[in-house]
From Swiss-Prot:
Molecular function as annotated in GO: aminoacyl-tRNA deacylase activity; ATP binding; proline-tRNA ligase activity
Comment block on domains: Consists of three domains: the N-terminal catalytic domain, the editing domain and the C-terminal anticodon-binding domain.
Catalysed reactions, semicolon-separated: tRNA(Pro) + L-proline + ATP = L-prolyl-tRNA(Pro) + AMP + diphosphate
NCBIfam families, A to Z: PRK09194.1 (NF006625), proS_fam_II (TIGR00409)
Protein EC: 6.1.1.15
GO cellular component terms attached to this protein's record: cytosol
Organism annotation: Koribacter versatilis (strain Ellin345)
Disulfide topology: none
Tagged with keyword Ligase: yes
Gene: proS
Keyword Calcium: no
Protein name per Swiss-Prot or TrEMBL: Proline--tRNA ligase
Family note: Belongs to the class-II aminoacyl-tRNA synthetase family. ProS type 1 subfamily.
Function: Catalyzes the attachment of proline to tRNA(Pro) in a two-step reaction: proline is first activated by ATP to form Pro-AMP and then transferred to the acceptor end of tRNA(Pro). As ProRS can inadvertently accommodate and process non-cognate amino acids such as alanine and cysteine, to avoid such errors it has two additional distinct editing activities against alanine. One activity is designated as 'pretransfer' editing and involves the tRNA(Pro)-independent hydrolysis of activated Ala-AMP.
């Protein structure tokens, strides 16, 4: 039996001064974690106990679909160079040299190592599919560690990798992971949403994130409460309401003086129109395409509706990953002969196709393509131009969905208002394709004896993030509560006076009875005031408390549900049934 008096559970009444988010404050106060250095934490008894339960759930579900490996955290430079990621990872990677001068790194993820095993060991389609996973410590030289366990430099991750003979096989492996992740997060008691995501540096053809809504999050997700639509704002779309175009004031573009009006809102108000009828112009310098001979930057101008924001991830996809930087005021003046705040699309010879690297590119957001009689900068100080119709008043290189979805816009599936909120990512699944098997030379023979590349998937879960997301979802002023499946203990039995032999003995018997019934129990046998014990019990995340006090002489104890604050007096025979009902996972 676990006795509180024999354990080290260093609870604190005050949160650390640098703690900003609830999970950081409470996990430190509850004695789960202690900071060793920036972004580096020790797990104390309660924290380690919870983490082990989380890891156990993940392992059980992953064993149903794959095989567990354990790979080295220390990786040679050569294997990361083979994939091209030694340079790509930059300062995020911890790098070191051994005594002989050989360069190594601490693994951030293990696509390369798993692919190397596949390259050496897999020979035939008969050996596929394969799903290999591990649960291991990872390292990332995070530039600004913060928010407790949410942004760290050392973390525990479940990463898995699938190898299939073709895309149809990858679809199956991907779905197996999707379903396993849903089971894992359901068992961990999390409220989560599965969203379509941008694959980013991972590459590949498909990607989904498992996200938990919390104000501590850094990723924005758009979701619909009326249907299943959910997407990271990097990928999210929405239906746009019809906008009434302005009536033309002339048959051709017309110059209009706008003295002292600099912002879109100021110009719109001055002209008596909505920002929805104005064009927002953004100017960038774009890196030369890979393989370009001269390596010169190319001008890129993006046009959005006046009330819309640019989605940089969508822009990156539209220009095929070429790096961009904002144009300086001097560059705008030199290239377009326009003051920076008055740049517009008129009187510029734009590239007709994206392959034309000699002229500036002009990209339109889709919301502007069919609009008429818009207002934009006139490339002249304190002047704008109206009656602009894209494709007539000026030509453009191309169009794409480039805007950021906003709160309340209609869902693309059902038209219901979208919710946009902060989230924390707890899991991510990718269809990697052939990126690593191609780069590292992994090949197998197909059923016709032809040498082909296996197709890959990559799948990750952040273990600490399951714990922190749960705390973020379930806390109040007094502390937090964890779902029974991942709480360090399910029940704390608290005698209100350990000096009273009957109460102390009764509490021991109740704790033993609950343990025999299969509950994970801690007995708070400390010689402390009841108020101190109750505060600690509320703080440390245990879902049920049993107070053994004055009514024990009547054969009753007080049973308290931490999350709902429901309290009732129960007889000893009733306790097991009541607690079992409370702790049963919701369907």
């Amino acid at each position: 039996m676990h006795r509180w008096s024999k354990l080290f559970i260093p609870t604190l009444r005050e949160a650390p001064a640098d703690a900003e988010v609830a999970s950081h404050k409470f996990l430190v106060r509850a004695g789960y974690i202690r900071q060793l250095a920036a972004g580096i934490y020790s797990y104390l008894f309660l924290g380690n106990r919870s983490m082990n339960k989380i890891i156990g759930i993940v392992r059980e579900e992953m064993d149903k679909i794959g095989q567990e490996y354990y790979l080295p955290a220390l990786n040679p430079r050569e294997i990361w160079e083979a994939s091209g990621r030694w340079a790509v990872m930059g300062d995020n990677m911890f790098r070191l040299k051994d005594r002989k001068g050989a360069e190594l790194c601490l693994g951030m993820t293990h696509e390369e190592i798993m692919t190397e095993i596949a390259r050496k060991e897999l020979r035939s389609y008969k050996q596929l599919p394969q799903i290999w996973y591990q649960i291991q410590t990872k390292f990332r030289d995070e530039p600004r560690p913060r928010s407790g366990l949410l942004r760290v430099r050392q973390f525990i991750m479940k990463d898995s990798y699938s190898f299939d003979i073709d895309a149809a096989g990858l679809d199956i492996s991907y779905q197996k992971h999707h379903d396993a992740y849903c089971r894992i997060f359901d068992r961990c008691g999390l409220k989560y949403v599965v969203v379509h995501a941008d694959s980013g540096a991972m590459g590949g053809s498909g990607s989904q994130e498992f996200m938990v809504y919390t104000d501590a999050g850094e990723d924005l997700v758009a979701s619909c409460a009326n249907c299943s639509y959910a997407a990271n704002v990097e990928k999210a779309t929405s239906k746009l309401e019809a906008i009434e175009d302005l009536v033309a004031t002339a048959d051709t573009p017309e110059l209009v003086h706008t003295p002292g009006q600099k912002t879109i809102e100021q110009v719109a108000a001055y002209l008596g129109v909505s920002p929805k009828n104005k064009i927002k112009t953004l100017a960038y310098m774009m890196a030369a395409p890979k393989g370009a001979k001269d390596g010169r930057e190319q001008a890129l101008v993006v046009l959005l509706r006046g009330d819309h924001m640019l989605n940089e991830a969508k822009l990156g996809a539209a220009i095929k990953g070429r790096e961009v930087r904002p144009m300086t005021e001097e560059e705008i003046q030199d290239l377009f002969h326009s003051p920076a705040g008055y740049l517009g699309p008129l009187n510029v010879e734009w590239a007709k196709t994206s392959e034309d690297t000699e002229k500036p590119l002009l990209l339109l957001d889709e919301a502007l393509v069919s609009r008429k009689n818009l207002i934009a900068g006139a490339n002249k100080e304190e002047y704008h131009v109206r009656n602009l119709t894209p494709g007539e008043s000026f030509q453009f290189t191309g169009s794409a969905d480039l805007r950021m979805v906003a709160e309340g816009e209609p869902c693309p599936n059902c038209g219901h208002a979208l919710k946009v909120g902060k989230t924390v990512e707890i899991g991510h699944i990718f269809k990697l394709g052939y990126k690593y098997t191609d780069a590292m030379g992994a090949r197998v023979l197909d059923k016709d004896g032809k040498e082909v590349m296996p197709i890959m998937g990559s799948y990750g879960i952040g273990m600490e993030r399951i714990l922190t997301a749960s705390v973020e979802q379930s806390n109040d002023d007094n502390g937090f509560w964890l779902p029974a499946q991942i709480a360090p203990f399910e029940v704390v039995v608290t005698p209100t006076n350990v000096s009273d032999e009957k109460l102390a003995k009764g509490a021991e018997e109740i704790a033993a009875k609950l343990e025999a019934a299969g509950f994970d129990v801690i007995l708070d046998d400390r010689d402390e005031r009841p108020g101190v014990k109750f505060k600690d019990a509320d703080l440390v995340g245990i879902p049920v408390r049993i107070n053994v006090g004055k009514k024990f002489v009547e054969g009753k104890v007080e049973v308290i549900h931490r999350s709902t604050r429901e309290s009732l007096d129960a007889t000893i025979p009733e306790i097991v049934e009541k607690i079992a009902a409370w702790l049963k996972p919701s369907a």
